[in-house]
Amino acid sequence: MFFAESVKIALSNLLLHKLRTSLTMLGMIFGVAAVLSMLSIGAGAGREALSLIQKMGLRNVLIRAKAFEEEELRIIRQDSPGLTRHDVQALGQVLPAGTRIHAKKEHKTYQIASALGRADSRILGVGAGYPLAANLEVVEGSFFLPTDGLKRHQVCVLGKTARRKLFGLNPALGEPVKIDALWFIVVGVLADQLLEKDEFEGVKIESVNNDIYIPLETLLAKYERKPVENELDEIIVQLPQDQDLSEQAAVISGMVASTHRNIDDFSIVVPERLLEQSRQTQRIFNLVMGAIASISLLVGGIGIMNIMLASVLERTNEIGLRRAVGARRRDIGRQFLLEALAISLSGAALGVLLGSSISSAVSTYAGWPTTITGVSVLLAVGVSASVGLVFGIYPARKASRVSPIEALRYE
């Protein structure tokens, strides 16, 4: 019996009992849908986590000033000066060669305007090397230079949203922007940065689109701040590739704690650790979802085996007749195995459609990122086919061992 003919007969037999076949496929449909949904959610979450962490910097250690009420700050300032440029200098003396340290300070302002518009942006004072640490891309002009900070130049770089609010479709480079009482000249515009989330593993991540960057030295020299306010809001330590992040994070924490007299007024964030925590959470999620999907596939496999055993019993006369006219045992076994495989693959195809719909719904309504890849589809279909083969072997062997004489006498 040719293989193509066996496939044709298998499909014909299944179509004779449409309802029974459909009910048998349900377990495979839900199992494959669960597997595909799990893989798509896992892939989407992994992609999003990596994207967010890359924006924070995989080789960075972040030192952030903690937020307190003003009265609490007054008490804390009796012992700790908060984050200052002295911390930057102290870290530079103990950290390995090749380490880059960048400081950041936000200026609270309510007056940002150009001749064409207004903006409600954050004003951030940073050094000239900050784009390397924060993965910022300049698409118009350039970032300001180290000399701009040293000479306290009043220059600025705009985020994409800030540029649109202040200048619309008009040119921005070389144009003045008023920040409180001071005028700054625009020297650059940043690329649009899309963030699907503003928080990751409890750590806040800010989009740069509405930010305006000015030299840190200019900000500290020309804008007043409250006596209890931190001189710096954040210090980014960019470590060389050959350094252990956990080990250096401990050194950084110890050094800053000593300059702050062991006052807990700062936090240490290691993006690489956050990525590992996210992956660990995702592994647990995949394990739970995998167990649920396995149960559904197991039920589907048992359903296939039951229906195929019933089919063997129902078609005993047919088996005997085929054996009598020359069909071999392996032809009979292959016939029933193909029917089991056809049920599982049909269920897999419908399961892929259902799983894709579930993934799309999760992305739309729950806001979770999902990614369906060719590998995940092949894996889901492969698992389904394997289940069909495994649970179809016993009925196929039983059918192939039916005695032709007994089969023809069976009623």
Locations of the language-model features?
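Hydrophobic, regular-secondary-structure patches
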Residues: 43-122, 129-132, 147, 164-165, ...
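Mid-to-C-terminal secondary-structure elements
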Residues: 129-144, 154-262
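Short cytosolic juxtamembrane segments of multi-pass membrane proteins
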Residues: 2-5, 14, 396-411
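Residue-level detection of beta-strand-connecting loop/turn positions
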Residues: 114-116, 135, 180-181, 367
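Transmembrane alpha-helical interface segments in multi-pass membrane proteins
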Residues: 6-11, 15, 19-30, 38-40, ...
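Generic structural signal for small/hydrophobic residues in well-ordered secondary structure
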Residues: 17, 45, 53, 63, ...
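Peri-transmembrane interface segments
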Residues: 236, 244-252, 258-293
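Transmembrane helix-loop junction
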Residues: 47, 164-165, 356, 360, ...
